[in-house]
Amino acid sequence: MQKQRNLYSLGLEEHDRLNKELGGGIPRGSIVLMEGDYGAGKSAISQRMAYGFCQEDATVTFLSTELTVSGFLDQMNSLSYDVVEHLLHERMLFLHADIDTGGVLSGSDENEGRMDLLTRLMEAETMWSADVVIIDTFDAVLRNDPTFEALIRQNEERQAALEIISFFRDLISEGKVIVLTVDPSTVDGEAIGPFRSIADVFLELEMIEVGNDVRRQISVMRFAGMGEQVGDTVGYSVRSGTGIVIESRSVA
C-alpha cells in the first residue's frame, strides 16, 4: 500500500491532478470535513476520493444518506470510476442510510427505530473496520438524530458533538481517516462548529459565478500534516464520462 510519509494517496495520477493538488494524499489519522452547499460537488469529490483510495489498495466504507446501491453504481459509472471489482473484493463497503422523515433508519422495528442514529452508527463495528470511512452527508445524520436535536434546542451544541468527536478521535488514533461531508445551510452553525474545530483537513467547496460561467473550487481552510505544499484553492469541474477534472484558471 502506498503510504508515503504516512499519507493515504488519492491515486489516479494519470487521470487527474487531485492527489498532487492535495499534497500527495490525506494524512493517516485525520478527520476531513468537506463543506459545501447543495450542488457544490461534495458527493462527486468524496466519490472520487473513495475510488482513488481503493485504487491505491486502501479499504473504504462509503455511507450515503442519498444514494442506494444501484444509484451509487450508476453515479460512479457515469464518472468512469469502476468500483464493481472493489465492491466484489471487499475493498469497498457501500452502505445506504435510508433515513425517513421520522428521523429513524427505515426498515428498523419500532424499538430499534427509537435508538439514536449516531449511537447506531457508532455501534456498527463493520462500518468502521476500513482504513477510510466516508459519510455523505453527515449533516443528514445530525439533523435526524433525536438526542442531538434535543441538545441543540437546549443550546448544548458542544455537549451534543462531544460523544461523536470522542469516538472519531479513538478511530483516528488507529491511523484511520474519516471524511465527513456537510451542507452548512441545513444545520446550525453552532452545531457544526465543534467539528470544524477538530477537523485536521477542512475543505470548503464553492460555486463561483464568472460571467455566465459557474466555476467550482475547493478552498483549503486547513490541512494539517500535508505531504507536499497544498495551495489555497483548487479549481475543478465534474464531467460525465470523465469524473473530476482539475482546472488551471486565470481570472482576468
Where do the protein language model's features map onto the residues?
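P-loop NTPase motor core
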Residues: 113-114, 118-197
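The Walker A/P-loop phosphate-binding site
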Residues: 1-79
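Hydrophobic/aromatic beta-strand patches that form the interior of the parallel beta-sheet core
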Residues: 32-34, 61-63, 93-95, 179, ...
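C-terminal regions of RecA-like/P-loop NTPase motor modules
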Residues: 1-6, 226-252
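Phosphate-binding/switch region of NTP-binding enzymes
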Residues: 176-240
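A short acidic, often aromatic-flanked loop/helix-cap motif at beta-alpha or helix-coil junctions
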Residues: 99-105, 211-212, 243-244, 252
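Structural signal for conserved beta-strand scaffold positions within catalytic alpha/beta enzyme cores
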Residues: 94-96, 204, 220-222, 246-248
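Conserved inter-motif catalytic segment of the P-loop NTP-binding fold
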Residues: 58-143, 147
